Amino acid sequence: MSKAIVLDSHLKEKGSVELPKRYEGINSHNLYLYVKHYLSSARANTAKSKNRAEVSGGGRKPWAQKGGGRARAGSITSPVFVGGGVSHGATNNRNYNLKINKKQKRLALEYALEEKAQANKLFVVEKIAIKGVVEDNKRKHLTKEANQMFQALEQRDTLFVCMNMDEYTELAFNNLKKCLVIDVSELNAYLLAAFSSVVMEEAAFQHAVQDKTEE
């Protein structure tokens, strides 16, 4: 059974906690489907080309129908002309969203957590809180404190998951390129797969692994 690594206040390993047994044997295809769903939902539908009705010009016949030796033409907005309309071009009314079932979302999240635990990249700490130093009635050195926490983990990049994230913790991690801090309500399988390691507050971990099959 896969286990998450429990860290103490100095981010040193002090134990482990098991993931629920239902996490075993989940098909990895659920994660693939969720990633496709996530990326397609985020896709901006902005690609647009003008058809022959939308390009400017073309109000008159460019040359006489007969006698010139050239192929007949009725308007310079025809797709055969340079600067004419585009045939079968991109339109901005396409829906790229891919449907995914609620159960598949849950299974994708569970598989991603299981995968991180098997790779020993899932960590649990009591609390993720960056307070900084109060100077002149302002909190300073927030990013410095967050970076020290990240460096202590010795990971390539890290996703931090809080139970109830405060604004100072969010601000502290915003300036770090290889870190992202989120509330547990924002946790999804794509983010778990995108980062090489995950650090979760104990309360956030318990919330994430609770059985949601009846919801």
Swiss-Prot record:
One biological process term in Gene Ontology: translation
GO molecular function: rRNA binding; structural constituent of ribosome
Region (Disordered): 46-72
Compositional bias (Gly residues): 56-71
Any one annotated GO CC term: ribonucleoprotein complex
Keywords from the UniProt entry: Ribonucleoprotein, Ribosomal protein, RNA-binding, rRNA-binding
InterPro entries: Ribosomal_uL4, Ribosomal_uL4-like, Ribosomal_uL4_dom_sf
Keyword hit for Ribonucleoprotein: yes
Purpose of the protein: One of the primary rRNA binding proteins, this protein initially binds near the 5'-end of the 23S rRNA. It is important during the early stages of 50S assembly. It makes multiple contacts with different domains of the 23S rRNA in the assembled 50S subunit and ribosome. Forms part of the polypeptide exit tunnel.
Family note: Belongs to the universal ribosomal protein uL4 family.
Subunit structure of this chain's protein: Part of the 50S ribosomal subunit.
PANTHER family for this protein: 50S RIBOSOMAL PROTEIN L4, LARGE RIBOSOMAL SUBUNIT PROTEIN UL4M
Identification of the protein by name: Large ribosomal subunit protein uL4
